[in-house]
Amino acid sequence: MIKSKGWNWKMVEDDSNCVWKIPSIESYYLLDRWKGLGFKSFLDLGCGLGRHTVLFASNDFKTYGFDISEDGLTRTKEWLDSLDLKADLKKGDMIHLPYKDNSFDCILCRNVISHQDTEGVKQIIKELYRVLKDNGECYLTLGSKSTWGFKQTSWPLVDENTRLRMEEGPEYKTPHFYADYDLIKVLFKDFKIEFINHIEDFYESNDKTYSSFHYHVLIKKVK
């Protein structure tokens, strides 16, 4: 198992236009869904700068934020404090979560668990199962083997599903795990898979258009 490595958030500007401070589109769907299911306890796994921690805390969830980055957690706390919101923030490695069994109704980990190799991802999934309550749900994303990053052969191959990102920036030398539909079915065999979506995102940079593919997966813990 490769050593876990988080983002270098010091390289990311902290302003209102920062994409990492804007809640993802699907987080609003999850907020509505999980409220409707009567869920109360929420874990933002890999909370980064706190965009989803703040969203759920401001909507009366008992909110927990977890990240490997001290800087990310510091900036999350500052944001919460500025809004007079509360959340339980912890620093650590997601392969060993510091929470009791059956702690959470719902977990969101967007572009998070992919930052490990295959063995690490399997261990994280075990932890997700452990800390979720029965009938609790987890929404997560995984890099797709259809995306450019997996095909980027200049990035070292860690194992058959994982490459080490060598592009300069906040993710430099961070492992990136990639999956396909069949692998996802195997990885989450102990859960009920509510849905799997394969989504292509487009973005502009230096007058060029780029895209990347991710799997969006909603799972439920069932006995």
Which stretches of residues belong to each language-model region?
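A short acidic, Gly/Pro-enriched loop at the edge of an enzyme's catalytic core
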Residues: 95-106
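A short His-aromatic
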Residues: 114-116
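A short beta-strand submotif of the Rossmann-like class I SAM-dependent methyltransferase core
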Residues: 109-112
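Class I (Rossmann-like) S-adenosyl-L-methionine-dependent methyltransferase catalytic domain
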Residues: 1-39, 48-96, 120-123, 137-223
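A short glycine-rich, Lys/Arg-flanked "PGG" loop and its adjoining helix->strand segment in the class I
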Residues: 122-134
